[in-house]
Amino acid sequence: MAYYGYHRISTKEQHLDRGIIEIKRFCENQKIKLESIFTDKITGKNFDRPRYTVLVEDVLRVGDTLIITELDRLGRNKQEILKQLRFLEEKGVRVMVLELPTTLFDLSQMENNLAKMMIETINNMMIELYASMAQAEMEKKEKRRSEEH
């Protein structure tokens, strides 16, 4: 059971350091041994990203945990985000999103099934909401760019 971080930026104005520091700080505070943080400097429109691909295809194993700071660092396309999260879940990889506190609970350790189902439901609703917001932000930026030309 290993912990890995992932952070993505897409513009020159963004800084990889912010996300890396946030992931490291979280792990230090929680006394989690972080193996490595994978980063990409590329758009979040799709998942054709070199370091993310290595992480998902070659590194992550059953029982591992992937830590990201914000859901939109995973991607900007709602359907692709949800597809990736399902893929990771099926692969047996837990995903922790630091901006979504309910994803920080280790549900496998919960004995109360009702509480577990409630937190899973809240997680799913929050992920749907945040994935929708990430896509809306991408569409707004694309519209602005097209209006500039």
Q: For each of these PLM feature ranges, what is it?
A:
Residues 1-147:
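Short, structured surface patches at the beginning of a domain
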